[in-house]
Amino acid sequence: MLSSLSPYMANPRNTLSQVLNFGLVLSSAFMVWKALSVITNSASPVVVVLSGSMEPAFQRGDLLFLWNRSPRVDVGEIVVYNVQGKDIPIVHRVMRVFPDVPTTGGEDVEGVEASQKLLTKGDNNLSDDTELYAPGQEFLDRKTDLMGSVRGYVPAIGYVTIMLSEHPWLKSVLLGFMGLMVMLQRE
């Protein structure tokens, strides 16, 4: 087994170069992700559709591109939101926008900027999303719950992510394959 590693042990400078190149690729991908996050004002500027609740508009596995710089959301717009206490992004259409009223405990507050209140529903669902919201939550808050509005998509390419989450052993195989390719790469 160690004999197969002998070419890498013989030239440590080449091995170090390959490890640094691999680190450069990973850090570049991270920087691109963070730059997209800043540009779009969204913690997750790219998400994958995980269910069929938005069919026929979006299929399971579609890759969505988000934008969160618009101050307002309109009825009919497709948004991605997180429910408080859950980490799974939900992609649904805005069905109703409530009037902007800055409130705290039911009383108007002066000097507090109002945030839109939204009601959403999946195109393929029979009822609105109030059952999906956190207990006691009747609507989404534009500022705190929304990750962004959908501005574009690529069909089916997100299935890789779905496969990796549904079959954890694939992650190990993929990482092992990538590591092997880095080690076998000759410059």
Swiss-Prot record:
| Gene Ontology CC: one annotated term | signal peptidase complex
Residue ranges, Lumenal compartment?
40-187
> Could you tell me the membrane topology recorded for this protein?
Single-pass type II membrane protein
Q: Which GO terms describe its molecular function?
A: serine-type endopeptidase activity
For this chain's UniProt record, which GO biological process terms are given? signal peptide processing
Per the Swiss-Prot or TrEMBL record, the active site comprises 53 (charge relay system), 92 (charge relay system), 129 (charge relay system)
| Residue intervals passing through the bilayer | 19-39
- InterPro entries xrefs: LexA/Signal_pep-like_sf (IPR036286), Pept_S26A_signal_pept_1_Ser-AS (IPR019756), Peptidase_S26 (IPR019533), Peptidase_S26B (IPR001733)
Q: What does this protein do?
A: Catalytic component of the signal peptidase complex (SPC) which catalyzes the cleavage of N-terminal signal sequences from nascent proteins as they are translocated into the lumen of the endoplasmic reticulum. Specifically cleaves N-terminal signal peptides that contain a hydrophobic alpha-helix (h-region) shorter than 18-20 amino acids.
| Assembly and interaction partners | Component of the signal peptidase complex (SPC) composed of a catalytic subunit SEC11 and three accessory subunits SPC1, SPC2 and SPC3. The complex induces a local thinning of the ER membrane which is used to measure the length of the signal peptide (SP) h-region of protein substrates. This ensures the selectivity of the complex towards h-regions shorter than 18-20 amino acids. SPC associates with the translocon complex.
Protein name listed in UniProt: Signal peptidase complex catalytic subunit SEC11
- The organism of origin for this protein: Ajellomyces capsulatus (strain G186AR / H82 / ATCC MYA-2454 / RMSCC 2432) (Darling's disease fungus)
* Higher taxonomy: Eukaryota, Fungi, Dikarya, Ascomycota, Pezizomycotina
